[in-house]
Amino acid sequence: MKKQILQLNLEQTSSAAAEDTNLDCSLAGYDYVLPPERIAQNPAVPRDSSRLLVVNSQTTGKETPPLHQIFRDLPDILRPGDLLIMNNTKVIPARLYGRKSSGAEVEILLLEERKFNCWLALVKPGKRFKKGTQIIFEGLGIRNLGIKNSPHYPLSPEGFPPSPVPNPHQLTATVLETDKATGGRLLQFDLPEGESLVQLLDKFGEIPLPPYITASQAADEQYQTVYAEQPGAIAAPTAGLHFTPELLEKLRDRNINQAFITLHVGVGTFRPVEVEDVATHQMHEEWIEIPAATVAQIKATKAAGGRIIAVGTTVVRALEGAAASGDLQEFCGKTNLFIYPGYKWQVVEGLITNFHLPRSSLLMLVSALIGRERLLNIYQEAIASQYRFYSFGDAMLILPEARGVNSH
């Protein structure tokens, strides 16, 4: 009788494990219900007053309950010798409003610069934007976001000094073609030789907020990290929004240092996964740069026994994408790496991240770190504990021990 019971229990355990594995690859396995009032419409003030849910050790097979702390407690949670990797991308004023020659109103969202002053953009309404259509944009008034020159979006092509725009209150663009992959349009902006659109976005564009933020009173600078330097993103790396200059200084004082990568966050970050078998999902491309100095810091930290803590899923994609060959190297280019349960980690050991949308590639990435079922249980606890979700929401810290990682 005992043998029969034991056999039955083994069969049930095997069946449950198989079902859980199947859900790891099923879109339905990443669904959860979020009350609308839990979607943060405004950021915490000050930044580091946001809440921090700490997922700690799970090395004995028994889950330790998460700890509920405040983000400014981070220096007391991390260890001296740990290294935080941060994304220094800067959100550009990529949303522009204009009109066609017929007077019809137009909204566009810049996605990426394909060549100098020639941009791929989403257009709304988009059905009637045929080749040759001209769009006229009116100035919104100069802003002080401090767009700087960067290798990815140079302010002027080599050999051409910037020249003044003839009409400083108006900007025009012409539709060159439709992009089949995105449904967007390739727009050629009509500017004097040597003049860059990036220089003019402060005047003609707006910072685009995510579609789920509908009633925000946030200033533009609140949707930038305090260490943002390289313009090119159309969405903020939101895990970094919680840091203040004072907190960064306190971390350095504790010998918890920081290194930087650049990943220009694209519109794909908001798009849900739509295929039922998540393994067949085609990830969007994003531009990344991993400097040699950051690679050296990471290798030195690991050699000294420190832990590599990624600040945000963008950093995870950048580091793991650059280490796809098995060894992290200096890198500049695009990645379409899709991380989901079963992924074999190369660089990242811990993660600071916000709470993500159901059925999103970001939720799958975090699931690859600590397990899908465990993550969804943590999300339910966060909802019950009144945490704020998504871009302006609270954060969670996944320590390496939570994954069973033996850090050196």
UniProtKB/Swiss-Prot annotation:
Biological or metabolic pathway of the protein: tRNA modification; tRNA-queuosine biosynthesis
Gene Ontology MF annotations: S-adenosylmethionine:tRNA ribosyltransferase-isomerase activity
Transmembrane segments: none
Keyword Transferase assigned: yes
GO biological process annotation, one example: tRNA wobble guanine modification
Keyword field: Cytoplasm, Queuosine biosynthesis, S-adenosyl-L-methionine, Transferase
Broad enzyme group: transferase
Reactions this protein catalyses: 7-aminomethyl-7-carbaguanosine(34) in tRNA + S-adenosyl-L-methionine = epoxyqueuosine(34) in tRNA + adenine + L-methionine + 2 H(+)
Assigned GO CC terms: cytoplasm
Cysteine-cysteine disulfides: none
HAMAP family attached to this UniProt entry: QueA (MF_00113)
Family the UniProt entry places it in: Belongs to the QueA family.
Function: Transfers and isomerizes the ribose moiety from AdoMet to the 7-aminomethyl group of 7-deazaguanine (preQ1-tRNA) to give epoxyqueuosine (oQ-tRNA).
Quaternary assembly: Monomer.
PANTHER family named among the record's database cross-references: S-ADENOSYLMETHIONINE:TRNA RIBOSYLTRANSFERASE-ISOMERASE (PTHR30307:SF0)
The name this protein goes by in its record: S-adenosylmethionine:tRNA ribosyltransferase-isomerase
Lineage: Bacteria, Bacillati, Cyanobacteriota, Cyanophyceae, Nostocales
